[in-house]
């Protein structure tokens, strides 16, 4: 299911901090991440997570 257009895109908090830090320095840098948010409900449904 896709995310609603009414909502803003999801960005993890720790990645948002990195982006804001780079924006204040006016630097351009590649941020490599494998970040994925997992909700508690999904974790309860599938104990392997």
Curated annotation (Swiss-Prot):
Name listed for the protein in its UniProt record: Small ribosomal subunit protein uS19c
GO aspect biological process, one term: translation
Function description: Protein S19 forms a complex with S13 that binds strongly to the 16S ribosomal RNA.
Organism encoding this protein: Sinapis alba
Molecular-function GO terms, alphabetical: rRNA binding; structural constituent of ribosome
Keyword Zinc attributed: no
Localization, UniProt: Plastid, Chloroplast
GO CC annotations, alphabetized: chloroplast; ribonucleoprotein complex; ribosome
Family membership: Belongs to the universal ribosomal protein uS19 family.
Keyword RNA-binding: yes
Major site of localization recorded for this protein: plastid
Keywords assigned by UniProt, alphabetized: Chloroplast, Plastid, Ribonucleoprotein, Ribosomal protein, RNA-binding, rRNA-binding
């Amino acid at each position: 299911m896709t995310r609603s257009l009414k909502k803003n895109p999801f960005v993890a908090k720790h990645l948002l901090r990195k982006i804001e830090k780079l924006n204040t320095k006016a630097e351009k840098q590649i941020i490599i991440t494998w970040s994925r948010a997992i909700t508690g409900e999904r974790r309860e449904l599938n104990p392997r997570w």
